Amino acid sequence: MRASSKKKVLVFDSGVGGLSVFQEIHRLLPHMDYLYLFDNEAYPYGELDQDVLITRVNKLVAALVEEHQADIVVIACNTASTIVLPSLRANLSIPVVGVVPAIKPASLLASQGVGLIATPATVTRQYTHELIRDFAQGKPVELLGSTRLVDMAEEKLRGESISLSELESILLPLRNKVDVAVLGCTHFPLIKEEIHQALGGEVTLVDSGEAIARRVKALLLNAMKQESREEGSKKIYASAPPWQEDALNTCLANLGFNPVQVYRLPGV
């Protein structure tokens, strides 16, 4: 990695959910330069063949890392993290940080039971069940997979209102069964307040954002001679023209980003 004072962080996701992870990292490291790429052309990742996903993510991330000389990559997507991290780490010479559902910290907090709210792909993946087996501390874990929650988070980011009654209906299987719930998709912290309300207001919600931010900070600051005190730049890219682009850009401006640029990579 470069020894300059200003480091570049590349955050990658299939949609805008990874912005919740970006916010946590930026809170700890406001003086870094940030690149955000969301692969909306292939969204949602849970429906992609595994080999296609591995090839696609490796090509996109490697190209952007080389073009912008990124110092660290954050895969802010649970589906991609469980499948692509080994190949990315083998192919890149910089650190790659992924997302893991926060089963262990949630289990330590729970007295009644743990709920895992994620995408259908995540709740059925063997990796997730291995996490539960190894880290659930003997606590019962209720699994709830929903793609609609992902869409709701995307809609909220574009200024649309969330139907609390619809949310309550989706989350009904967890009511009165858990006292801690894991937000197992990076989209879900974007609607954290609504989820908390829909679950009755007494369920503790846990996600991986803060832990990822601490990991990124540790890796970057160890490689820096001196931390910059100037506000970093923020650029955001999409692999296809985004849905409701004007509304999205309004929200992104509030986070300090310039308007979305379309990033096309031949052969992907």
From Swiss-Prot:
Pathway: Cell wall biogenesis; peptidoglycan biosynthesis. Gene3D superfamilies: 3.40.50.1860. The active site is at residues 77, 185. Its EC number is 5.1.1.3. It catalyses: L-glutamate = D-glutamate. InterPro entries: Asp/Glu/hydantoin_racemase (IPR015942), Asp/Glu_race (IPR001920), Asp/Glu_racemase_AS_1 (IPR018187), Glu_race (IPR004391). Substrate binds at residues 13-14, 45-46, 78-79, 186-187. One of its GO terms (molecular function) is glutamate racemase activity. Provides the (R)-glutamate required for cell wall biosynthesis. This is Glutamate racemase. It comes from Vibrio campbellii (strain ATCC BAA-1116).
